[in-house]
């Protein structure tokens, strides 16, 4: 079967410069790389063709020979390279772009590669809902969290008591192996030890070689007074157990404060809308409000109070987290219009309306006068 034209393989013209070649190679190598197409023979074949084409065309001498003689330039030892031969990494190859293209795909470079050593346990998340009263006073909550803990039979080794894990013979304990892919040397997780660097011939009967078991733990969580909705509490070392002696992860408690029936919160301040009767608003009066600390606070309503009027109860809001300060409670007045009037009530209101003057309702009287003047000019 005749070889495909190198320029066609990379999808570039015969006048393509080095930048165009490199760009085309990056795109195709990422698309057909074996790590992204496991067990795909066609992709592997295409990947090798791309490598060979780029290796040839990026080298000025090889490209000149190819342009003149085609594939024949590299047959029977011509040019001392081509295919799987002389070029490669020894001549710079494409190691200059290897890490750039595949570094992230391979786990982000050497710093991220498993060495078969200690491995930190995973962090855990626990969602907790509390009441506004609990956020006000603070509390100690008991929670139960399913998590992975170190096996108490094998002490986390994964091996049956009296035995020890052995260094993996395939990767020599590194957890990684290298395999040739065309001009590339590709690093993968060791298929024998699955990245652990160790093998266990006689696994622990309780954890089955994992070194960890799943259990439900009871934990005490301290919720300070003044905590806000959406706050995250970190319990260090209370996440999943580490592997092979690695440190445990952390447990994060995500708090949500349940909406309250009467109070709305804004930072450390509380707001409460209180409906009062029309007569109380007109004549004045008092009412009591029960605050979150359980005490009652009396609010005095002056006569002539209008809808939306706010009264401030200083220091009756929420405590400020880790502070001696406290917010305020704001009472907003809502005037309730009477409904289902009796005949006598209706008569009295009609009589009241007849006795009313502009001074009794300055806002409404002034509003309609201003509107009339505005539109009538």
From Swiss-Prot:
**Cofactor binding annotation:** Binds 2 Zn(2+) ions per monomer.
Annotated Zn(2+) 2 binding lies at: 168, 171, 190, 193
- What Pfam families has UniProt attached to this entry? DnaJ (PF00226), DnaJ_C (PF01556), DnaJ_CXXCXGXG (PF00684)
What are the ranges of the CXXCXGXG motif repeats? Answer: 151-158, 168-175, 190-197, 204-211
- Where are the disulfide bridges? none
Compartments, as annotated in UniProt: Cytoplasm
Q: Name one GO molecular function term.
A: zinc ion binding
Signal peptide (UniProt feature, chain positions): none
Binding residue positions for Zn(2+) 1: 151, 154, 204, 207
Recorded GO cellular component terms are: cytoplasm
Protein induction: By heat shock.
Q: Which cofactor does it need?
A: Zn(2+)
**GO term, biological process aspect, one:** DNA replication
In terms of one coarse class, where is the protein primarily found? Answer: cytoplasm
Q: Where is the J domain?
A: 5-70
Domains: entry comment: The J domain is necessary and sufficient to stimulate DnaK ATPase activity. Zinc center 1 plays an important role in the autonomous, DnaK-independent chaperone activity of DnaJ. Zinc center 2 is essential for interaction with DnaK and for DnaJ activity.
Oligomeric form and interacting partners: Homodimer.
Similarity annotation = Belongs to the DnaJ family.
Which PANTHER family does this entry report, sorted A to Z?
Answer: CHAPERONE PROTEIN DNAJ (PTHR43096:SF48), DNAJ HOMOLOG 1, MITOCHONDRIAL-RELATED (PTHR43096)
Entry protein name: Chaperone protein DnaJ
Protein source organism: Agrobacterium fabrum (strain C58 / ATCC 33970) (Agrobacterium tumefaciens (strain C58))
């Amino acid at each position: 079967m005749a070889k495909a034209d190198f320029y066609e393989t990379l999808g570039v013209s015969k006048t393509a410069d080095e930048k165009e070649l490199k760009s085309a190679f990056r795109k195709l190598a990422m698309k057909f790389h074996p790590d992204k197409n496991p067990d795909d023979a066609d992709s592997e074949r295409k990947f090798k063709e791309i490598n060979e084409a780029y290796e040839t065309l990026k080298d000025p001498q090889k490209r000149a020979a190819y342009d003149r003689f085609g594939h024949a330039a590299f047959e029977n030892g011509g040019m001392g390279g081509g295919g799987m031969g002389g070029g490669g990494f020894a001549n710079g190859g494409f190691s200059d772009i290897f890490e750039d293209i595949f570094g992230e795909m391979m786990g982000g470079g050497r710093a991220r590669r498993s060495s078969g050593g200690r491995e930190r346990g995973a962090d855990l998340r626990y969602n907790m809902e509390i009441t506004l009263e609990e956020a006000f006073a603070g509390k100690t909550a008991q929670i139960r969290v399913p998590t992975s803990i170190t096996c108490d039979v094998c002490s986390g080794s994964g091996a049956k008591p009296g035995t020890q894990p052995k260094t993996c013979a395939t990767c020599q304990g590194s957890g990684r192996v290298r395999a040739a892919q065309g001009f590339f040397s590709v690093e993968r997780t060791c298929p024998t030890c699955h990245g652990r660097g160790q093998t266990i011939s006689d696994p622990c009967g309780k954890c089955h070689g994992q070194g960890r078991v799943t259990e439900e733990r009871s934990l005490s969580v301290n919720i300070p007074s003044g905590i806000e909705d959406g706050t995250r509490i970190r319990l260090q070392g209370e996440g999943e157990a580490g592997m092979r002696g690695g440190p445990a992860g952390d447990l994060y408690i995500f708090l949500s404060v349940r909406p309250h029936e009467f109070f709305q919160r804004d930072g450390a301040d509380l707001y409460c809308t209180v409906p009062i009767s029309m007569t109380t608003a007109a004549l004045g009066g008092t009412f009591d409000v029960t605050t979150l600390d359980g005490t009652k606070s009396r609010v005095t309503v002056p006569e002539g109070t209008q809808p939306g009027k706010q009264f401030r109860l200083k220091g009756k809001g929420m405590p400020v987290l880790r502070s001696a300060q406290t917010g305020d409670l704001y009472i907003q007045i809502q005037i309730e219009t009477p409904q289902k009037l009796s005949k006598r009530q209706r008569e009295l209101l009609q009589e009241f309306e007849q006795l009313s003057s502009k001074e009794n309702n300055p806002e409404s009287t002034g509003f309609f006068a201003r509107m009339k003047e505005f539109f009538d000019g």
